[in-house]
Amino acid sequence: MVKANENEYRLNFFLSRGYERKICRSCSTPFWTLDKSKENCSDVPCTDYYFFDIKIKSPPLTVRESREKFLRFFEKRGHTIVPPKPVVAKWRDDLYLTIASIVDFQPFVTSGLAKPPANPLVVSQPCIRLEDVDNVGITFGRHLTTFEMAAHHAFNYPDKQIYWKDETVAFAKEFFTEELGIPEDQLNFKESWWEGGGNAGPCFEVTVGGLELATLVFMQYEIRGQDYVPLKLKIVDTGYGVERIAWFTQRTPTAFHAIYGNLVSSFYKKIGVGEVNNELLKAAAIYAGRIDPDIKETITAHREHLAKQLGLDLKYVNEELTRAARVFQVLDHTKTIALMLADGLVPSNSGEGYLGRLLIRRALRVLRLLGSDVKLHELIKDQIDYWKEDFPQMLKNKDYIVDAVINEEEKYNDTISKIPSILSTLSKKSKVDLDELINIYDSNGISPDLILDEARKRNININVEIPHNFYSIVAKKHQNALVRENRKDKIPKEVIDEINNKKIEPTVPLYYKDQYLRTFNAKVLLNYKNFLVLDQTTFYPEGGGQIGDTGIIRSIEGNKQAKVIDTQKYKGVIVHILDKDSPFIQGEQVYGEIDWQRRYRIMKHHTVTHVILSATRRVLGEHAWQAGAEKTEYKGRLDVTHYKLPTEEEIRKIEDFANYIINDRRKVRPLYIERTEAEMKYGVSIYAGGIPEGSEIRLIEIENWDIEGCGGTHLINTGEIGGVKIVNVEKLQDGVIRLEYVAGDMVSNYARQQDEKLNEISKLLNSPVSQINVRLKKHLEEYENLQNLLDKYRKIVLDRIQEIAERISVNGITIYILRDFIDEQLIKEVMRKITSNNQNIVISIRGKDTKNVEIATSKDIKVDKIVDELRKIGGRGGGKGTYGSVSITVEEEKIIDTIRSAITNGV
């Protein structure tokens, strides 16, 4: 929908070259063309695809050739080629995946905070969009989950203009006519409007023969509520479809044939289904623009039209095109999965990992629908081999990609086993709505169509309507990251109000000038109860996983003093939290001293965290990205993304790497560097520990080992750490593992604790520490022998239990009474055996003063009433179905009489 004034689109370029502004007779959208007879905008659905018939001078171009032609064209015209960023948007805290080339420069470059890497520039950025995942294949190439957006960008500042609309449109005309040889009268510039990321502007969609080949956006407004405010920085934001250019020049039956070449036939064979006739596919593709996947009837109409035109049976057409669409989906999804994982995504139940798992499971589901037993990871290997020159990170991370997908395949199979229990729950409901379906998918990873398949097999009726775009709905719901709010809990609102009302200037952080500075003098700027703000300080405020400093602050005269028990920060203002109301007055000079021993230990744990993170990435793979961290006086904690628990050997390697770097006494230094320069020089891995703000960022460099953004305090040499010991590794959540470690003198402290535990075990085993393993092994062997012997005795008792157990009969029901049986396993086995036959109850009574009563009944007897009667005489507990447990302080005979009475009165 065009929102801009017509003058926004009335360019000198069009007027000088004789273009006419026309209105599409189908969609009523204005467009510019040299063809005076043209009546529509040459975009689907206003027309069918007819680009197959347009004569062009360009030879058929592969995806790689299309990309190179575009990049070199703009390089020759003064644009600097910049490398693409990963498809996992690690430099953004509000977005998981790279959905467009402009994302590379948001938010810092587009806001004017940071400089672009070049101006103007050109890039071919791989992108991933999952909001149309259900449409892939159905439209024969119009929808893809992964595509390359070839783009040239120009950033126009008030004092430095690069180029704007006329030049951008001229570049498009020149590229399409001279590089691809498209007749100029076939080009159409369709007026449109773009909005995204809080910005907006007019744009042109460049269409040829029904195919949109490019979009030319002119980002010139900021959206503020209902208003569009002109931006000082005006940005040329273009996007050319590399895959569409390849399809346009190759004129293959579908876009998938142009993108994947011989992989198409290979996938048909490996999946084990017949290849669909190319003539049928080409005919289907020509009319594919008529398909609106959100309207099921358009798919039906498309296939009916095709069957009629080609004189084919409709059932045959449906079967062939459905099979082709599914194979195309597998082709598309496997490439996207390989790209995601190659760029560091770890499949999980949250964040970007959720989107990765969603696509993996959708691919597995499609393979099931195709009746294929091929392994998904085998197909992904083929994608890696096919794209390894275009995306070398795929080959570099091949082992991780394949292993992670195998792991996901195993989890998916485990998930399938949960379907019957979920089906049982849903069958009892009158209707199952979309929210519940999404909740089931989020919680269990089970898609609704799998549930329906199982329901049909079992002849179970479930009242549910599954939207055709279920995966798209779920992906859209999870595509944006949840922006975490900065916690201000430790600074009360009253203090924040005081800071804002008095316009307190940011505190000078002396700890950056000298990280070893212990004492300082400062002036009091603000007092509020036990909260104190100074003009400068060496107290480090909590942030980046490093806890806040403690220490003392006293008056220069020494007659007033308070302990600092914590340090926090609000918008650059450092707040000292005291152990009592501040004794100081505003404007007073004070003396501060941090608890140096505590800070020094924290610095060791912070620096070693950087060492360990880099070691972890070297051992586990580059996908191991920091997901959280904490550095305290006593230990460090690092959470990293990884798909399974590391082996003991991997943990040893990480620890050995870290201690090698410590013993090698590597220099550690802070660097202050312009953000864009840092990204170009070191890559987005500088954001492994978080995304710092500002145009200039602070990096911590460990010589020839690690470099990442960090605002914490560090040692100047790794040798000062002394040593590190990993003390615990555990799975924190799906896709995230936690490492805990101690450094410096905390290593000896940990060793002392371990010695104490060993000595305690030594006493218990009555063995010297050096012989613990031998003695323990012997005890375990004896224990195993005793267990075997006990199992034999249990079997003897179990075989004769109905003969030897005390029992009474009430109303035809036999009650077996087990008094003071201490073997819990035997009790359970007795209960299971006896209650397998109807009209039986087993009661186990244990304990002296307080009796623990367990009741098991056969299926024909409900335990509830028995439990209710025991509650009436003071029992506490509950029961359901055929088992109950009650704690009670009455005599055994009273318990038995109560149960007898309950049965007499009918259970």
Swiss-Prot record:
Q: Where, by residue number, does Zn(2+) bind?
A: H606, H610, C710, H714
The keyword Aminoacyl-tRNA synthetase appears for this protein: yes
Q: Which reaction does it catalyse?
A: tRNA(Ala) + L-alanine + ATP = L-alanyl-tRNA(Ala) + AMP + diphosphate
List cofactor names only.
Zn(2+)
The top EC class, named as a word, is ligase
What SMART domains does UniProt report for this protein, alphabetically?
A: tRNA_SAD
Q: Name one Pfam family in it.
A: tRNA_SAD
Record function comment: Catalyzes the attachment of alanine to tRNA(Ala) in a two-step reaction: alanine is first activated by ATP to form Ala-AMP and then transferred to the acceptor end of tRNA(Ala). Also edits incorrectly charged Ser-tRNA(Ala) and Gly-tRNA(Ala) via its editing domain.
Q: What's the domain remark here?
A: Consists of three domains; the N-terminal catalytic domain, the editing domain and the C-terminal C-Ala domain. The editing domain removes incorrectly charged amino acids, while the C-Ala domain, along with tRNA(Ala), serves as a bridge to cooperatively bring together the editing and aminoacylation centers thus stimulating deacylation of misacylated tRNAs.
Which protein family is named in the record?
A: Belongs to the class-II aminoacyl-tRNA synthetase family.
Annotated protein name in UniProt: Alanine--tRNA ligase
Q: What's the encoding gene here? A: alaS
